From Swiss-Prot:
Residues exposed to the Mitochondrial matrix side: 46-59
Pfam families associated with the record: COX2 (PF00116), COX2_TM (PF02790)
Binding locations of Cu cation A2: 197, 199, 201, 205
Gene that specifies this protein: MT-CO2
Membrane topology recorded in Swiss-Prot or TrEMBL: Multi-pass membrane protein
Binding site for Mg(2+): 199
Protein name listed in UniProt: Cytochrome c oxidase subunit 2
Coiled coil: none
Enzyme class of the recorded protein, top EC level: translocase
Length: 228
């Protein structure tokens, strides 16, 4: 969960966010190395006799270097990116499917694998919050899923564009009216994870939070029974 004055990414709570952080660190390292090399060459060229060389002189080694180097950098950036994109999109034998539908300005969740459960999830007003509950993030009815098992979330919208997002899990998918988008969702631990609609969708866009609770499997099965 984010906190005040936070400069870093949120702690990874699932395999998708771990991939996102790895890719971020990988690209950041390449960027720092490129910056150092370019700075070194710039300082060298402006402070040594290299600046007095004939600019029309052909230097085949340099031409080869500034052709091959960018290609290698792009390859080193692209390969991890493609891997991460694949893992973020592919769903492997999900234990459960949940449909999330965006409305102005709340979410509806529907469970249909062997059960028929549907409920709306509204933000709790500040004056009604319990002590310790996060402001503008807590809802009256959380989405619940089993921890440690992959869940498929199918996302759509009823009226305008929305976006279903939980930063600590590294997931963000657009909710488009008339279209179904899916994403794999898994957590590495039990807990409550918060997000918000990340697509401007009207006057109350800022008051459309997402709260997902990951519980042990036996607790989740008990919750399913209680909701029927």
């Amino acid at each position: 969960m984010p906190h005040a004055s936070q400069l870093s990414l949120q702690e990874a709570m699932g395999p998708t966010m771990e991939e996102v952080i790895f890719l971020h660190d990988h690209v950041l390292l390449l960027t720092c190395l490129m910056t150092m090399v370019i700075t070194m060459f710039t300082l060298t060229a402006t402070t040594t006799a290299l600046t007095h060389n004939d600019p029309t002189e052909e230097v085949e080694q340099l031409e080869a270097a500034w052709t091959v180097a960018p290609i290698m950098i792009l390859i080193l950036t692209a390969l991890p990116s493609v891997r991460s994109l694949y893992l973020m999109e592919e769903v492997f034998n999900p234990y459960l499917t949940i449909k999330a539908t965006g409305h102005q300005w709340y979410w509806n969740y529907e469970y249909s694998d062997g059960v028929k459960i549907s409920f709306d999830s509204y933000m709790i007003q500040t004056k009604d919050l319990q002590n310790g509950s996060p402001r503008l993030l807590e809802v009256d009815h959380r989405m619940v899923m089993p921890a440690g098992l992959q869940t498929r979330v199918v996302v759509t919208a009823e009226d305008v564009l929305h976006s279903w997002t939980i930063p600590s899990l590294g997931v963000k998918v657009d909710a488009v009216p008339g279209r179904l988008n899916q994403l794999p969702l898994a957590t590495s631990r039990v807990g409550v994870f918060y997000g918000q609609c990340s697509e401007i969708c009207g006057a109350n866009h800022s008051f459309m939070p997402i709260a997902m609770e990951a519980t042990p499997l036996h607790h989740f099965e008990q919750w399913l029974i209680s909701e029927q």
